[in-house]
């Protein structure tokens, strides 16, 4: 009888021990689940906060773009739009202090795309190699000490046929995607060329643009020396440097004045002008520890004497993170 009671007590003790362990395991499991839920909740909150901040930074960038439009519109309204030069407020936007906003700032740059070489001018209206634009692109590459085979690859990228040009490349040479076979909308398409190197793209980018008009005039008041040399073989490096120096003091008031300064006795190889309709707007926003860059290509339509100045967005690209901010 005594042994039986002892055995019963031992069984009861073991059962209480098992129950205690079970309770502890349940509490541990609940604690793990609660911790995981709390961690996920914190991640979700951070994710939502980052999304909200990124979206707000983008809206600030659009506000900066709207301000850039006002500068470009005011240039026309004030009667200065007939001549666009580097002394005008839109051209000096990057020299102004950033706009201060709550927990951040907005930096604005405006660049005249008609002061750059138009990559789409490499082909003519029939989608074939242009007798002027194609060799000019080669000349630009040589002037920048870059591989002039890029010109062949670019021509094959945007021309309408599938015939390789010298060292060029057509659809069969690009695994996973095809050539455009038409004028491009953004210079970043150059990155897709078969042999394009990142450092070469970075060196070439400040001198080029892609415009919807193959024959858009080059603005001699904003073009850099490398582009000015493309206008005529008689424009030497030294002469191009002198022309750029003139730009810094207001540039040229007439085409004849430029031709005389450049030593041109006949028309330039491409159309030239004194004003511009195509601009690149770069907006960099710092907001709540977030960086946002928006690059917009604008076409400015001057309107009529009674009509307002209007703008068309040809392209807009944004990047939440940037690595080239100075």
Regions found by a protein language model. Name each.
Residues 2-8, 18-326:
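Compositionally biased linear targeting/interaction segments
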């Amino acid at each position: 009888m005594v042994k039986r009671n002892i055995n019963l007590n031992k069984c009861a003790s073991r059962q209480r021990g098992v129950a205690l362990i079970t309770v502890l395991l349940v509490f541990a499991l609940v604690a793990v689940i609660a911790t995981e839920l709390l961690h996920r909740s914190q991640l979700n909150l951070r994710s939502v906060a980052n999304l909200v901040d990124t979206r707000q930074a983008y809206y600030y960038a659009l506000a900066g773009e709207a301000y850039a439009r006002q500068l470009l519109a005011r240039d026309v309204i004030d009667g200065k739009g007939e001549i666009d030069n580097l002394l005008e407020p839109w051209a000096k936007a990057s020299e102004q202090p950033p706009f201060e906003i709550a927990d951040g700032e907005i930096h604005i740059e405006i660049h005249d795309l008609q002061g750059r070489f138009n990559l789409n001018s490499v082909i003519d209206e029939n989608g074939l190699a242009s007798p002027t634009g194609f060799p000019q692109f080669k000349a630009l590459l040589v002037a920048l000490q870059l591989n002039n085979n890029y010109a062949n690859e670019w021509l094959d990228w945007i021309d309408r046929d599938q015939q390789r040009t010298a060292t060029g490349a057509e659809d069969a040479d690009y695994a996973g995607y095809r050539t455009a076979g038409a004028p491009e909308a953004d210079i970043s398409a150059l990155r897709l060329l078969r042999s394009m190197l990142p450092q070469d793209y970075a060196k070439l980018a400040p001198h080029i643009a892609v415009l919807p008009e193959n024959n858009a005039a080059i603005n001699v008041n904003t073009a850099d020396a490398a582009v000015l040399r493309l206008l005529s073989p008689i424009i030497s490096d030294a002469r191009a440097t002198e022309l750029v120096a003139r730009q810094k003091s207001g540039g040229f008031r007439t085409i004849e004045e430029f031709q005389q300064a450049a030593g041109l006795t006949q028309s330039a190889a491409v159309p030239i002008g004194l004003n511009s309709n195509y601009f690149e707007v770069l907006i960099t926003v710092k907001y709540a520890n977030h960086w946002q860059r928006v690059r917009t290509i604008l076409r400015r339509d001057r309107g009529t004497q009674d009509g307002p100045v209007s703008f068309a967005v040809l392209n807009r690209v944004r990047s939440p993170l940037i690595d080239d901010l100075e």
